[in-house]
């Protein structure tokens, strides 16, 4: 049996400007990060082989170093899980471009399409969301 978690629209590092005070927004951002860690704990407990993140991992093109470091370190801490990432309309193709050492278990799709084999029973194929400008 193949166990895969599909998640999307995490919107990590959101500013939460419209509804919260600065302190409430920071508290909410921390809760988002803890929810990600809880998802990973669930994945470990259930012996999940892969996690597919289908868009809008982050809320804007500019991601704080703290959030990026947290996200990448949590992936590195779980080499037994393969992570597959498709950009959404809030993500940018530069999201991971300047990261020097991406975890070996993080697989990025592209707007040209890409395929990854999780094991002998599951092939993941995807085409990322592309902006109008990227499509030209």
Pin down the residues of each PLM region.
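His/Asp/Glu-rich metal-coordinating catalytic cores
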Residues: 50, 61-136
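N-terminal active-site segment of His-dependent metallophosphoesterases
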Residues: 1-70
